[in-house]
């Protein structure tokens, strides 16, 4: 499976093919120093002006961010459930606020995309996708949905990312630029390290004041930051910038908040660790999904549904052909004892198995897979964790994979009899 993924990843995407064609026609190659933006030509700008510090008087909005001239790079600290590396915050987004604190949203329905991963791969930016898979995380386990939401709600409202701002435009190039700049800014703002250097580290016993947290982050940023809490728990930080020039190539200058204020209490802020508390008195136990010594529950028997959950939240079910679906009616499956504590599954379409790593049910399946049950979850070869590329949405279905490979969403499957 990994070799196939590697082969597919090496196939040039549409954008790369267009770029090669441009070179063969005598156009400027993409490595040309005058080409500004991540592989395509961004229009030339004259005198660059700093957004929000300069009033709008008819400037070219391909070179001057307006009306969204106050850029917020926002970061999450999700500890329960734990999301992302234990020694790093994660990305929420990059938001183009108005200079007075207002904002626009969902600004261009014609550029509403639901395939961010494919856009990045097609642009030859698997490196960027890998970074996002590590640091741009959704607490519900649906990273692609968060990426889509951030682009559609906020990215489409950045004036300098309009398609006409590119003199040599390649499809979805502005999408790549948006995510590339957001990840770049995130790495320039190492919140975890900044707090740790000030003696502020995740703890189950130590609490902090709002002044301590804000002071450490604001000094490092060069301007006041906004911190957000939920039930006294530190959860989010917002960094504010004005931009001199376009988002793609402009200079991001730290700025004061645009009216947004911190909501954390003055004292008693909890910075909860992402790692489980080893003190049994707090009731935090690591999640266990593997049971190498065999099944730990009664096998599924009879007629029932296969319900899918991500991050402990129910998110649809499996339908007859074996795909994950979040709308409509769950398919009925029959569980039949195979040997010992194992069983097979079948739907109206036929027996079920993992064919080419994908959960599939159909009359062409000659050797049904044998499953077991562990803590009420479906288990295959001792593992209750399965994987998907993307959570289903509307009428869109998703395949379920047995191996992790390049499938970022983790899920579990329970039996509902």
From Swiss-Prot:
Reaction equations catalysed: a ribonucleotidyl-ribonucleotide-RNA + H2O = a 3'-end 3'-phospho-ribonucleotide-RNA + a 5'-end dephospho-ribonucleoside-RNA + H(+)
Q: Which residues are glycosylated?
A: 115, 383
Q: Name one GO biological process term.
A: RNA catabolic process
Secretion signal, residue range per the UniProt entry = 1-22
Q: What class of enzyme is it?
A: lyase
| Entry EC no(s) | 4.6.1.19
Give the top-rank taxon of the lineage listed in the UniProt record for this protein. Answer: Eukaryota
Keyword annotations for this protein?
Answer: Cytoplasm, Disulfide bond, Endonuclease, Glycoprotein, Hydrolase, Lyase, Nuclease, Signal, Vacuole
Which Pfam family is one of those matched by this entry?
Answer: RNaseT2L_C
Molecular function terms from GO: ribonuclease T2 activity; RNA binding; RNA endonuclease activity
Q: List the disulfide bonds.
A: 45-63, 52-99, 62-165, 107-157, 229-264
| Localization per record | Vacuole lumen; Cytoplasm
Q: Which CDD domains does UniProt cross-reference here?
A: RNase_T2_euk (cd01061)
Biased composition, class Basic and acidic residues, residue ranges: 276-288
- Spell out the SUPFAM superfamilies in the cross-references: Ribonuclease Rh-like
Q: Which InterPro entries match?
A: Ribonuclease_T2_eukaryotic (IPR033697), RNase_T2-like (IPR001568), RNase_T2-like_sf (IPR036430), RNase_T2_His_AS_1 (IPR018188), RNase_T2_His_AS_2 (IPR033130)
Q: Where is the active site?
A: 92, 150, 154
Q: Where is this region: Disordered?
A: 274-296
Q: GO CC terms for this protein?
A: extracellular region; vacuolar lumen
Q: What does this protein do?
A: Rnase which modulates cell survival under stress conditions. Released from the vacuole to the cytoplasm during stress to promote tRNA and rRNA cleavage and to activate separately a downstream pathway that promotes cell death. Involved in cell size, vacuolar morphology and growth at high temperatures and high salt concentration.
Q: Which family does it belong to?
A: Belongs to the RNase T2 family.
Write the protein's name.
Answer: Ribonuclease T2-like
Q: What is the lineage of its organism?
A: Eukaryota, Fungi, Dikarya, Ascomycota, Pezizomycotina
**Gene name per UniProt:** rny1
């Amino acid at each position: 499976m990994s070799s196939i993924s590697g082969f597919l990843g090496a196939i040039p995407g549409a954008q790369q093919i267009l770029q090669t064609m441009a070179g063969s026609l005598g156009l400027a190659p993409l490595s040309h120093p005058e080409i500004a933006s991540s592989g395509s030509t961004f229009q030339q700008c004259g005198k660059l002006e700093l957004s929000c510090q300069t009033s709008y008087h008819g400037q070219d909005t391909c070179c001057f961010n307006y009306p969204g001239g106050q850029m917020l790079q926002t970061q999450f600290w999700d500890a329960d459930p734990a999301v992302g590396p234990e020694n790093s915050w994660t990305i929420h987004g990059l938001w183009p606020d108005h200079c007075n604190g207002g904002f626009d949203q969902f600004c261009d329905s014609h550029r509403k995309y639901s395939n961010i991963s494919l856009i990045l791969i097609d642009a030859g930016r698997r490196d960027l996708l890998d970074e996002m898979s590590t640091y741009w995380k959704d607490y519900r386990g649906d990273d692609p949905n968060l990426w889509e939401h951030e682009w559609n709600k906020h990215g489409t409202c950045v004036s300098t990312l309009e398609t006409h701002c590119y003199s040599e435009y390649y499809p979805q190039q502005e999408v790549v630029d948006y995510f590339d700049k957001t990840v770049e800014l995130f790495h320039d703002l190492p919140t975890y390290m900044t707090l740790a250097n000030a003696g502020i580290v995740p703890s189950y016993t130590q609490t902090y004041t709002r002044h301590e947290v804000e002071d450490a982050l604001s000094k490092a940023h060069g301007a006041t930051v906004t911190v957000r809490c939920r039930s006294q728990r530190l959860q989010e930080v917002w960094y504010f910038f004005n931009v001199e020039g376009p988002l793609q190539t402009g200079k991001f200058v730290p700025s004061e908040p645009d009216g947004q204020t911190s909501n954390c209490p003055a004292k008693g802020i909890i910075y909860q660790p992402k790692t489980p508390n080893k003190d049994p008195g707090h009731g935090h136990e690591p999640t266990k999904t593997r049971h190498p010594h065999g099944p730990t529950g009664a096998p599924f028997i009879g007629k029932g549904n296969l319900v899918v959950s991500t991050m402990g939240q129910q998110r649809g079910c499996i339908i007859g052909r074996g795909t994950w679906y979040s709308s409509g009616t769950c398919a009925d499956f029959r569980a039949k004892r195979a040997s010992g504590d194992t069983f097979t599954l079948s739907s109206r379409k036929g027996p079920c198995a993992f064919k080419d790593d994908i959960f599939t049910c159909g009359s062409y399946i000659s050797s049904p897979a044998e499953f077991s049950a562990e803590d009420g979850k479906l288990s295959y070869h001792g593992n209750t964790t399965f994987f998907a590329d993307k959570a289903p949405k509307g009428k869109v279905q998703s395949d379920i994979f047995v191996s992790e490979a390049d499938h970022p969403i983790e899920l579990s499957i329970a039996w509902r009899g």
